[in-house]
From Swiss-Prot:
GO BP of this protein: DNA repair; DNA replication
Enzyme active site: K124 (n6-amp-lysine intermediate)
Record-stated family: Belongs to the NAD-dependent DNA ligase family. LigA subfamily.
InterPro entries per UniProt: BRCT_dom, BRCT_dom_sf, DisA/LigA_HHH, DNA_ligase, DNA_ligase_AS, DNA_ligase_CS, DNAligase_adenylation, DNAligase_N
Enzymatic class: ligase
Pfam short name (any one): Nlig-Ia
Function according to Swiss-Prot or TrEMBL: DNA ligase that catalyzes the formation of phosphodiester linkages between 5'-phosphoryl and 3'-hydroxyl groups in double-stranded DNA using NAD as a coenzyme and as the energy source for the reaction. It is essential for DNA replication and repair of damaged DNA.
Keyword tags: DNA damage, DNA repair, DNA replication, Ligase, Magnesium, Manganese, Metal-binding, NAD, Zinc
Keyword hit for NAD: yes
Annotated protein name in UniProt: DNA ligase
Amino acid sequence: MVLKEPPAERIQQLRRLLQRASYAYYALDQPIMEDEVYDQLYRELQELEAAYPEYITPDSPTQRIGEAPVSQFESVSHRIPLYSLENAFTFADMVAWQERWQRYWRTLRQEEPLPPAEYVCELKMDGVALALTYENGLLVRGATRGDGQRGEDVTSNVRTIRPIPLRLALDNPPPVVEVRGEAFLPLERFHQLNQERQAQGEPPFANPRNAAAGTLRQLDPRIVAQRQLDFFAYALHLPEGGSVPLGENQAGEPQSQRQVLYALQHLGFRVNPHHADCPDLEAVKAYYDRWQTARHQLPYLTDGIVVKLNDLKLQQTLGFTQKFPRGSIAWKYEPEQAITDVLAITVQVGRTGALTPVAELAPVQLAGTTVSRATLHNADYIAELDLHIGDKVVIHKAGEIIPEIVRVFPELRPPTARPFTMPTACPECHQPVVRPANEAVSRCGNPRCPAIVRGQIRHWASRDALDIQGLGEKLVQQLVTKELVRTPADLYRLTAAQLLSLERMGQKSADKLLVAIANSKQQPWPRVLYGLGIRHVGSVNAQLLADRFKSVEELATATVADLCGVDGIGEEIAQAVQEWFQDPDHQSLIADLQALGLQLAAALHPAQKALTTEKSLNGKRFVITGTLPTLTREQAKALIQKHGGHVSESVSRQTDYLVVGEKAGSKLRRAQELGIPCINETELIQMCR
């Protein structure tokens, strides 16, 4: 590449061009550059930075995706609490809210006249709240809401979201800028993702919000980048003061929500364009009524509107309740309802053996999706509804997510309708069903029931447990049906040959899954405990127990009294834990997991595991060539070193193995000439076990 100017200058010029183009495209929605031109300049910048790495900076457009996957997210404190909003559901709720803040204001400022009730209304995005921190104009942190005081540090994932600027579009930014906004998945991309997942045998996402939340908790930023999240900013704080654009020829600290939105856009953020100034609650109602209907024309989901007092000083004076800011509120849309027919009632068997009846419905459109099923919980729920197969019913989405039946029309019941009775034999394994005393749920008592095993494996692989990416529902079905997997421990004995015998499983997918399974061994003790699937032990209780009992041996030998001594653990949970560990099958599973190297003690957190793992590659010398299917070169190098091996840059007679990926070069020819064994990624991973 021949340069007309010094490389440092050209690199800076390219960055400015690309950042200006991104600002125009995302913040202003006014593209100034063709995609082909952008791509060409981006590639030139990549090449220059590769040639002159000393000029790479964190805010370069090329550095959005560059961090290696993490083992877990750190908890971080919000400098300014990120509160959720109080919900209103009717206009009467809105009137009551206005009366409350006005009444509270009078208790604070009895001598002063009541300030005007001027509002700014914005669409409430159905996504995931993020808190972004910029220092001297550079993005230094992105965190989830969490409990409002503390969230998870997802900076590496946030950097991949293109509408979020890595550097603020301001020459002299304030020392610290805090931005709040919503990450979401546009509907078109949501449907594309689900098509891709179903083609790969993975379960589809239930809705765009779940997809966005799951994406932000991915440990690998490359996956986040592929999913193409979007972002709208809505709040701005300057904790150390400073000046931002507030209008034409105007700058300073924002005094109104209107100025906040203006400033955000001129700092480089996308702001939802459908906001409005509303001088009173009647105008707010008109805005709400409009979007209650018009929301279905938008390319993303919105589940209500957010109403904020425009005056920021007034908001600040009103402060917060224990849970919510007093100066803003979310007015949720009315849940959509639809009438349909119950075609059948089927029964699902869960991982604990619980039998759950499900209404199979004539498909109907509801809240932007096609609904064909609704949960019926248990036999008592069906009896309370007086529901028959063949009935005409009203369904709605609880929280606009979970479809449920809210009304039955017995007066429209056809002569062919028939009542439903819970089966006395499990629909999966045909063993007897029992209904324990004082429980509304019937259960299959066969621990080897295929449905129970499938549920246990799915739970083990779930996000909050061992988080095994790629182990979808259809794949679990095949593994259990072919009896390749009977317990979670069997996952760690799977071979590439076994996986390749399954439908729709190629070498690349098999390699990727084996890596994900191997990586899950590094998950800490609380996640493993949750993954065991003990009744009543969710992720929160698993953390409580793991904090008190530092190993599986301590927990397995704890008495009910010991367990009840943990704050938050009652007798019912304690009994369930004790009974689980007394089961011989479960004792065998624990022994298996220990032998396989799972983290069943706090002392064997990933940071310590490297010190205790048997060094299976001790003294061996490796060279890596080409692109590996799932591991980056740095990850492969770290894996080899972790197990006692050494990595060299060039092949010599001292090389023990060459790890070969796609587009291998001269190193492969040299290794073949010297007779050095060549292995692929899967074989490397198996050597590390």
